[in-house]
Curated annotation (Swiss-Prot):
Keywords for this protein: Calcium, Lipoprotein, Metal-binding, Myristate, Repeat, Sensory transduction, Vision
PROSITE patterns given in the database record: EF_HAND_1, EF_HAND_2
Tissue note: Retina, in rod and cone outer segments, and pineal gland.
UniProt function note: Stimulates retinal guanylyl cyclase when free calcium ions concentration is low and inhibits guanylyl cyclase when free calcium ions concentration is elevated. This Ca(2+)-sensitive regulation of retinal guanylyl cyclase is a key event in recovery of the dark state of rod photoreceptors following light exposure.
Protein name: Guanylyl cyclase-activating protein 1
Transmembrane segments: none
One Pfam family it belongs to: EF-hand_7
GO molecular function: calcium ion binding; calcium sensitive guanylate cyclase activator activity; guanylate cyclase regulator activity
Positions bound to Ca(2+) 2: 99, 101, 103, 105, 110
Domain remark from Swiss-Prot or TrEMBL: Binds three calcium ions (via EF-hands 2, 3 and 4) when calcium levels are high. Binds Mg(2+) when calcium levels are low.
SMART domains to which the protein is assigned, alphabetical: EFh (SM00054)
Length: 199
């Protein structure tokens, strides 16, 4: 991960770091979070297949050294990126998250599946359907019309479009995860709400 570790940690307050470390070590005494523990950590249970695939993809993007675990530094770097990262850093991460097959481009199917999964987990109440949102993204930023978004098209297109940037940012809002950490793992949502979100 290189410089990302130090930079991420420096941007956090001592209190935040302490809360995150306490939560991490309480839930994961080994210091290495597996995919299963990752799901438990954030209260992600009974997920639909598409939501489960999204969580796996998120885990893989947070596992910076690709060893199959998220250690504390990866955890801090990931949360810092998502919560405090600059727009271009977040957009690069979103792109990596959406590019499920890792081919360097996002196609309509990848974006649609991820948006559906995110909405299932976050219970987003957007007026636009996932299909309408996907079509809007491609209509606005697929410059060459090839049905795929390159990193450049994605970065430039989203940064130029405030509406698109706002919707993407809200869809990946992880404040519920921060509340979970601050509440020492006590989920602020009732269990029946979590089950509803999984369907």
């Amino acid at each position: 991960m290189g410089n990302m570790d130090g930079k991420a940690v420096e941007e956090l307050s001592a209190t935040e770091c302490h809360q995150w470390y306490k939560k991490f070590m309480t839930e994961c005494p080994s210091g290495q979070l597996t995919l299963y523990e990752f799901k438990q950590f954030f209260g992600l249970k009974n997920l639909s297949p598409s939501a489960n695939k999204y969580v796996e993809q998120m885990f893989e993007t947070f596992d910076f050294n690709k060893d199959g675990y998220i250690d504390f530094m990866e955890y801090v770097a990931a949360l810092s990126l998502v919560l405090k990262g600059k727009v271009d850093q977040k957009l690069r991460w979103y792109f990596k998250l959406y590019d499920v097959d890792g081919n360097g481009c996002i196609d309509r199917g990848e974006l649609l599946n991820i948006i559906k999964a995110i909405r299932a987990i976050n219970r987003c109440n957007e007026a636009m359907t996932a299909e309408e949102f996907t079509n809007m993204v491609f209509d606005k930023i697929d410059i060459n019309g090839d049905g795929e978004l390159s990193l450049e098209e994605f970065m430039e297109g989203v940064q130029k479009d405030e509406v698109l940037l706002d919707i993407l940012t809200r869809s990946l809002d992880l404040t519920h995860i921060v509340k979970l950490i601050q509440n020492d793992g006590k989920n602020p949502h009732a269990p029946e709400e979590a089950e509803e979100a999984a369907q």
